[in-house]
């Protein structure tokens, strides 16, 4: 996988972004057009997420969301040797990114690594902590902190919708 994965504006979604969209900010029953835009973006490879996001959302046991995820399985990218290596390197560079006691996994490094490999913007529900990253083990850093340190673009759901509407 490389930057050629994303031919247009590409967005890599974190678990918190999709969960917040579904349960509060952009509920499908209230804003079905948002989900139509997301579905269309998935079809052309402009909306992606790592498999680990799927696995985290699967634990939510939200049956309607699980049904949607299964219908849009193409969004969730399989692990590749390159992605695994990128995640290992990221966790080495940012040991305070992952909750060490989180079971069974933490999707955060996978989201960042996939976005970096694909040249995608990250959409997350997390807020920047302002913590300086690199070498520190405490306090825990969040996705926006690491993205800032690595020069990976951050975007909001509104940014995504606007970009996808402009791409039509």
Residue ranges of model-derived segments:
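Acidic, PIN/NYN-like endoribonuclease modules and their adjacent C-terminal/linker elements
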Residues: 1-7, 31, 128-168
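Residue-level detector of structured alpha->beta connecting loops
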Residues: 46, 73, 116-119, 151
